[in-house]
Amino acid sequence: MKDDFAEEEEVQSFGYKRFGIQEGTQCTKCKNNWALKFSIILLYILCVLLTITIAILGYKVVEKMDNVTGGLETSHRRYTEKLTEVESDLKKLDDQAGQKALNTNTELSSFRSDILALRQQLHDIAEKTTRNKDTLEKLQESGNVLDDRQSQIRSALDSNSFMIISVNKTLQAYTGYINNLQQDTSNIQSDLQNQVHSHNVVIMNLNNLNLTQIQQRNLISVLQKSMEDKSLAILRIKNDFQNLQQVVLQARKDTDWLKEKVQNLQTLAANNSALAKANNDTLEDMNNQLSSFSGQMENISTIAQANEQNLKDLQEQHKEYENRTSAKFNQLEERFQVFETDIVNIISNISYTAHHLRTLTSNLNEVRTTCTDTLSKHSDELIFMNSTLANIRLDSASLKMQQDLMRSRLDVEVANLSVIMEEMKLVDSKHGQLIKNFTILQGPPGPRGPKGDRGPQGPLGPAGLKGQKGEKGEPGPPGPAGEKGPPGPIGPPGEKGGKGSRGSPGSKGQRGSPGKTGLPGPSGDPGPPGPQGKDGPQGPQGPPGFQGLQGTVGEPGVPGPRGLPGLPGVPGLPGPKGPPGPPGPPGPGMPMALQSEPTSVPEANGCSPHWKNYTEKCYYFSIEREIFEEAKLFCEEKASRLVIINNKEEQQWIKRQISGKGSFWIGLTDSEKENEWRWLDGSLPLYTNWKTGQPDNWNHGHGPGEDCAGLIYAGLWNDFYCEDVNNFICEKDMDKEQIFGV
């Protein structure tokens, strides 16, 4: 630049000394000077033009710099606005994540409270089961005590039966002694014929003894009548022994009274098989004694003379024996009274235990139904909670993915912003240098010089300032699980928590199935004797006996006990069909329906009264309650059957009919083969409407299970014990004749 200015000074000094004045003499030199002057003038003009263009260019450059700075400011504002928007979006996302976290925390807390309530309910159920176990153990102990008492009663009854057998044997021996006192051989032979006939009758009755207990009692009454006939014959033969006969009658009164007591004991202990066997043994002994009696009667004729001397001794012995027997009878009466009181106490205890067992089974049924309902509800709630947890996990995973995407986007945006800021810093530095260069160029610039050689490389600049700390990076993937550490020491027991708030009462459970029917009650005391029956038909005429001696008229005997009614006879065969009757006179010409009034007007739907019609079938909905077999027999007596449900429409119609009326039997059972349900006609069900969890064949762990089906509330099917008492539904085909008025 200095060289240029020096040249310009030299040129100026050369030109301005003589500006077209002193060059007249030298022509060539003048021409050269004028050319130089003209060139200098042109140079000045060019310099002025250059300065003007440079000024214009500088103005344009300044305007462009102003535009660039304005654009930088607007871009900076836009970036700041975008950054604020991004920060607000991040805050909104953080708020939403916090709200979702709070919602998840509340749901988890409610879930924990529900789990605690479930645990409390399970704990209560466990306590109830322990209580029921205690009650069952007590019942088992009471059952064992009852078994011991029953064994004692059986032993006492065995001893009583043995005593009765001994008394019967003594009485038979006593009758044998009395029979040995007969003297008149002719009368004894006639009596023997009667005895043989009665013996044949007794043998025939003994053959029919094993059929029923009623025939056995009739046979005993026949034997008693034969003994009374024999005693009357002895009274007619022996007029001298009237006093002895009165004593015998008194003894027989006592025996009849004793037999009545024995019959009462037999009715009270009807289920005692040992007593029945003892009665059979006594009857067999009586048969043997009767057979021996026929042999003894043959020897009576030889022994009669010897017995005359022993009559007085026998009378004394008989008096002593009477006293002994009266004392023994008094003792037996006292023992029987004690036994009766013991039996009454035992029966009351058994009835009390049976009632207690019924209540316990009903309670167990209620507990079972409540447990099943609560378990089903809890299972539904757990399934719903599992589904909600799965949804929460999916939502949390999606939120995590969105957060990761937002973080990656933020990182990219921040990196882009950092790059843009660096670029803007560089642009600002360049603009600053340009502005400095523009401020230095104050004077008019000179002409551009030649390009100089490249200078040496300058030293490195100082290191820049340390940048700000970057944001926290994304969490890395989880590392592998470490080895399990040693178990730590057991911590101290925590403090007992405060009592939680009482939970809301649960919803009312479904109605449980009815309990099993109780055991049959004990047989009651025998009722008072009924009125005297009518005289029976006359028996067959016996063979004529020998003419006996005329005896004295004896005292009227004590009326014997009333005999039991006989078995109903076998119905006879139907008689032959009679000949057709003559035709009747012609009637008036009116229809038969108008001539006779029907006894019971059938309904217009073709069903009997109290029956309902549906799809060409009649249905009977019972008001009374029966067990399954009784309900089946009732329907069969009505020429129908227990209902068979074949489709959903029939099920819905029956459901509407029985709503709010309890449980009803249907004709479905698996009694033939377990878990193979069939209708009573043997067909498999094509349509079912079981309650959830049914049939469960619940049998309390003992005895037969639930083998009969019925309808419960809402028309659902459930399995019951066949001994349960329910209503029932009968079904039969519609009588089409009633529809047409036939």
Curated annotation (Swiss-Prot):
GO terms for molecular function: carbohydrate binding; low-density lipoprotein particle binding; metal ion binding; pattern recognition receptor activity. Ca(2+) 2 binds at residues 670, 674, 697, 706-707. SMART domains: CLECT (SM00034). Residues 467-526, 527-586 form the Collagen-like domain. It is a single-pass type II membrane protein. The chain crosses the membrane at residues 38-58. Disulfide bonds join 607-618, 635-730, 708-722. Residues 1-37 are cytoplasmic. Ca(2+) 1 binds at residues 644, 646, 650, 731. It holds the Pfam family Lectin_C. A carbohydrate binds at residues 691, 694, 696, 706, 718-719. It comes from the Eukaryota. Residues 502-522, 532-556 have a biased composition (Low complexity). This is Collectin-12. The lineage of its organism: Eukaryota, Metazoa, Chordata, Craniata, Vertebrata.
